[in-house]
Amino acid sequence: MTKHIIVIGGGLGGISAAIRMAQSGYSVSLYEQNNHIGGKVNRHESDDFGFDLGPSILTMPYIFEKLFEYSKKQMSDYVTIKRLPHQWRSFFPDGTTIDLYEGIKETGQHNAILSKQDIEELQNYLNYTRRIDRITEKGYFNYGLDTLSQIIKFHGPLNALINYDYVHTMQQAIDKRISNPYLRQMLGYFIKYVGSSSYDAPAVLSMLFHMQQEQGLWYVEGGIHHLANALEKLAREEGVTIHTGTRVDNIKTYERCVTGVRLDTGEFVKADYIISNMEVIPTYKYLLHLDTQRLNKLEREFEPASSGYVMHLGVACQYPQLAHHNFFFTENAYLNYQQVFHEKVLPDDPTIYLVNTNKTDHTQAPVGYENIKVLPHIPYIQDQPFTTEDYAKFRDKILDKLEKMGLTDLRKHIIYEDVWTPEDIEKNYRSNRGAIYGVVADKKKNKGFKFPKESQYFENLYFVGGSVNPGGGMPMVTLSGQQVADKINAREAKNRK
């Protein structure tokens, strides 16, 4: 008899797991509370402006392509992606600008401000991150290893310690190899992919630089939601039954097993396995009603990653100095991280990510106008949340900074504005305290690991998404879905012996 898999949540991790389970011959039902598939890969359109509500950067497209290849199909028949050799532009408070290109040689050619020594150091750092990336790929990615003990067992103690570089933080690894202060800050902010601090995260996450340099940075034509639409189409073709606008209210259990879910309609649906794309702590808290003592223990080790104050701006002018992806850096990177991740306050001088897809895709804004998305990282929702007045002051601070750093009269040119706070993120995606990136990567608290993909409390409950390994970011959450499918397939194969 065909076994039934229930997937809770249609984010990239959930839809990826659903596709792989269906490709493996299981009956799969996916329940998503929103009316779209993709989770935070969402879309907002108004007044002829188009915005990616969630992620704006596509890296490591091969992870997505694999899902189509399992079905003997090509992703290019479903969605079009475009490589961006000019990966991003970095603006610094003193007026310095650095353009990051795919390739160290190209970066050197386009930045007269960088010396021969800077480029040599950058190449040395890339070589270091390549070594980490390669060993991480062997175990952490290919086999879905979930804990430090599993990694030590797989690679051996000495090999794991040296090649994963668990001795240093990410910023220490950068500062050891890079002397240019601008490059130090730019490379440190690669930690944005997992919503953490480069001063707290383990050096193993330096691999993010090599991943982007080797695999490239891509744009999904028409908006990144088209990638989610492509995965939804593939899932339906593979026989996944998708229920949008349907919320799972709780998970039923018997002893150490989950038995099914109760929907908001009152219907009970049985399952042999449940895969939750809802974050781990909200799943335990709201769907399984885990006791407070165990929840508190989990929250201490697996603290939420950062959230964001997300502004979507329709602007009645053009700023030629902007690239597709831009970063407006802070005067004091350490203080910015300290305020967000330790003091838990809205930062005085935030580093700001600004994406302007209109630079690549002119369909995203009216002629002569620009669609500007602004994202500084801020703390997740605290026990005493920020007030409307706090956010209003922070908005002014952001606009002041952008105008000061070259976006002249930005306020005057805003003709459309839509803002998302951590409270909006929590409400729409049921994320833990409004975090965008799942669990924070912290060398002291969790060695940079997120939750294991297998539940420690229930034998047939699995998790995917940003709160589990291999981590946040679109390719990683998609990979988590494939890894969970591999784990269930291996378990079933073992049971059949």
Curated annotation (Swiss-Prot):
InterPro entries attached to this UniProt entry: Amino_oxidase, Carotenoid/retinoid_OxRdtase, FAD/NAD-bd_sf
Q: Which cofactor does it need?
A: FAD
Recorded catalytic reaction(s): these are: all-trans-4,4'-diaponeurosporene + 2 AH2 + 2 O2 = 4,4'-diaponeurosporenal + 2 A + 3 H2O
MF annotations from Gene Ontology: oxidoreductase activity
* A GO BP entry: carotenoid biosynthetic process
List positions binding FAD: V7, I8, G9, G10, G11, L12, G13, G14, I15, S16, A17, A18, I19
What pathway or pathways are given for this protein in its record?
Carotenoid biosynthesis; staphyloxanthin biosynthesis; staphyloxanthin from farnesyl diphosphate: step 3/5
Q: Which UniProt keywords apply?
A: Carotenoid biosynthesis, FAD, Flavoprotein, Oxidoreductase, Virulence
User: SUPFAM superfamilies this protein is in?
Assistant: FAD/NAD(P)-binding domain (SSF51905)
| Pfam families tied to this protein | Amino_oxidase
**E.C. number(s) listed in UniProt:** 1.14.99.-
Q: What does this protein do?
A: Involved in the biosynthesis of the yellow-orange carotenoid staphyloxanthin, which plays a role in the virulence via its protective function against oxidative stress. Catalyzes the oxidation of the terminal methyl side group of 4,4'-diaponeurosporene to form 4,4'-diaponeurosporen-4-al.
Q: Which NCBIfam families does the UniProt entry name for this protein?
A: crtI_fam
Family of this protein:
Belongs to the carotenoid/retinoid oxidoreductase family. CrtP subfamily.
Entry protein name: 4,4'-diaponeurosporene oxygenase
- The species this protein belongs to is Staphylococcus aureus (strain MRSA252)
